[in-house]
Regions:
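Short, charged beta-turn/beta-strand-edge "cap" motif at the junction between a beta-strand
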Residues: 97, 141-145, 149
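Non-DNA-binding regulatory cores of transcription-related proteins
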Residues: 79-138
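N-terminal intrinsically disordered, low-complexity, charge/repeat-rich segments that act as generic
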Residues: 1-76
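Generic serine detector
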Residues: 20-23, 30-36, 40, 89, ...
């Protein structure tokens, strides 16, 4: 269970760091477009502002997604021990650790690798409700649950 709590906390930190980085990037783009616009006129200026606005909208979308993931992660009780795979479970399958939480992908953590799965991920859906020792077949591959918390 300690692994799950540490992974959960580390994932929170990564999300917060990424939101902070994107916010700084957004501020810089906004500042740069304002500064480049001073004393400029014409089509070149308008195109520059439009491109900056598109980039800001893209960053805003990324920040919004990260905030949604942060909210979803807050709902998970990392202290809870599970006997079957469900939201908040951390499990080993085919010598790989997985955390049923948010779509984050592979997370390098304390000299090991944990793959963060969303609740829509095909592997999660195939294994949901199963216990240690049980298997599921996905894309022609057998997945056996070796450990679960």
């Amino acid at each position: 269970m300690m692994l799950k709590t540490r992974v959960h906390d580390h994932l929170f930190q990564l999300l917060e760091k990424r939101v902070s980085e994107l916010s700084i990037q957004r501020t810089q783009i906004s500042h740069d477009s304002t500064e480049s616009g001073k004393g400029s006129a014409g089509d070149k200026h308008e195109v520059g502002i439009a491109m900056a606005q598109l980039e800001i909208e893209k960053i805003d979308g990324q920040i919004n997604l990260l905030q949604q993931q942060h909210t979803a992660l807050k709902r998970i009780d990392a202290q809870q021990t599970h006997t079957h795979i469900q939201i908040g479970s951390i499990f080993m399958c085919n010598e790989q650790w997985f955390y049923c939480s948010i779509a984050f992908g592979q997370l390098e953590f304390e000299q090991s690798s944990v793959f963060c799965l969303s609740l829509e991920a095909p592997l999660y859906l195939a294994l949901k409700g199963k216990k240690v020792g049980e298997t599921a077949l996905l894309n022609g591959k057998t997945w056996k649950i070796e450990a679960l918390s």
